[in-house]
């Protein structure tokens, strides 16, 4: 082995684990050795239908608890006096299993959108937001703590003293706040948002602020981790049912808004949104009633307190209903789960890939054979699989869920473990070959950005 000249700062020496072919990306391993970056071909998987509630359900929403690595689904249990209920799901072996459902509100609950539940990663708590019909439909929140396959709750707190509609929520990880968006029945169902702070098993709120002066429906929210902004997407019932979005900024316990932007000029239903960390963009999906009820999506780009949109893309040519959106970071894609009402009301998913201000879709995949409604989608970032929950109309309206994994190539190459390109294959024999020999490689650029490595091309 030749010594590296001290003045050559672009070449390094390290102990190799395995052979390093010439000109390949090199990563540092946990034991300090280095190896060529590896990739894995992941096949498409559609898991079996798994029942989480053997009764009719409504108002389904879901989130992923990254502290316990569990999926939490909240819903109205019509088999138990319409009580608000939640259940913990564990994803493993391409399937999902559930613990025992737990009541969080002993009264009829309602008006929970697909994202009416969120996970606070600062306090490691789940927050469920709902209309409490046992208390004049007031907007109410409750904090849940996951332990094993169960969940326990603190005391419910009212965030809106009037009737509350079409609830969405997200977690602002920059400010460690929960943001809830909703239609305020005390003010003509206009769009309002409020900031919540979780402490222990409770939550407190600042003052609500209006983001839409007309009646706001299908309220949904997502958080942009790069810009530190919340985006609320909705239908403006007072402006020809157009699809609109607004950027929100959290400061302390207050929230303010930029200018409202239109993403669809026609009648818009079933609005869903999520943030794609791979592209740094928002994806909004919706039903376009101005174009034969097709499923459409649009990419949103945040600049300061404004959002702009690229061209619409179609993910479903048939009538699209009951949709939900979930980013799938493992494949740098975004999933749109929905009901295809022109194809036996099946539950389907279409995976979108964002490039610039555009999104392209891979093609619809059947998740269910029968009718579904009230769907919600969530990404289990521990198992790297999506979970779709819904009311299974084909099976007595039971609460049901499926695991889904799209076909994609994964790699162990990241911006944190990449250290350069190999400068040449090294021959070594004897015990050195198994323990790792010192090899020379070129460190090259100090940063790795957004590339994929195919080990089959070695």
State what each model feature region is.
Residues 41-410, 429-458:
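Extracellular, repeat-based ectodomains that mediate carbohydrate processing or recognition
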């Amino acid at each position: 082995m030749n010594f590296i000249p001290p003045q050559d700062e672009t070449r390094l020496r390290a102990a190799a684990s395995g052979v390093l072919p010439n000109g390949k990306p090199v990563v540092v391993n946990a034991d300090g050795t280095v190896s060529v970056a590896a990739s894995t071909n992941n096949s498409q998987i559609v898991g079996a239908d798994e029942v989480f509630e053997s009764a009719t359900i409504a108002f389904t929403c879901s989130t992923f608890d990254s502290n316990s690595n569990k999926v939490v689904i909240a819903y109205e249990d019509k088999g138990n006096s319409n009580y608000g209920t939640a259940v913990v799901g564990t994803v493993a072996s391409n399937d999902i299993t559930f613990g025992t459902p737990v009541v969080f509100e002993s009264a009829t609950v309602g008006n929970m959108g697909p994202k009416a539940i969120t996970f606070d990663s600062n306090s490691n708590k789940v927050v469920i937001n709902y209309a409490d019909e046992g208390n004049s439909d007031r907007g109410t929140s409750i904090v849940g703590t996951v332990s094993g396959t169960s969940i326990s709750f603190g005391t419910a707190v009212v965030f809106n003293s009037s009737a509350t509609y079409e609830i969405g929520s997200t977690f602002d990880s920059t400010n460690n706040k929960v943001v809830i968006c909703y239609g305020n029945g005390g003010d003509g169902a206009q769009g309002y948002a409020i900031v919540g702070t979780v402490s222990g098993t409770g939550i407190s709120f600042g003052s609500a602020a209006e983001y839409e002066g007309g009646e706001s429906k299908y309220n949904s929210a997502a958080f942009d981790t790069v810009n530190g902004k919340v985006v609320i997407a909705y239908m403006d019932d007072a402006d020809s049912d157009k699809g609109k979005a607004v950027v929100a900024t959290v400061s302390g316990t207050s929230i303010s808004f930029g200018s409202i932007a239109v993403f669809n000029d026609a009648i818009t239903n079933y609005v869903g949104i999520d943030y794609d960390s791979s592209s740094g963009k928002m994806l909004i999906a919706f039903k376009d009633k101005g174009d034969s009820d097709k499923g459409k999506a649009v990419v949103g780009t945040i600049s300061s307190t404004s959002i702009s949109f690229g061209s619409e893309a179609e993910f479903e040519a048939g009538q699209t209903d009951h949709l939900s959106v979930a980013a799938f970071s493992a494949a740098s894609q975004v999933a749109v789960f929905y009901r295809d009402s022109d194809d036996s009301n099946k539950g389907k998913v279409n995976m979108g890939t964002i490039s610039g201000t555009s999104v392209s879709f891979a093609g619809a995949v059947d998740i269910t054979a029968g009718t579904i409604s009230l769907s919600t989608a969530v990404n289990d970032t521990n198992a790297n699989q999506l979970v779709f929950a819904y009311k299974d109309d084909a099976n007595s309206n039971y609460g049901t869920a499926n695991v889904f994994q799209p076909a994609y190539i994964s790699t162990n190459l990241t911006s944190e473990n990449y250290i350069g390109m190999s400068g040449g294959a090294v021959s070594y024999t004897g015990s050195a070959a198994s323990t790792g020999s010192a090899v020379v490689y070129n460190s090259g650029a100090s940063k790795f950005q957004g590339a994929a490595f195919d080990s089959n091309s070695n």
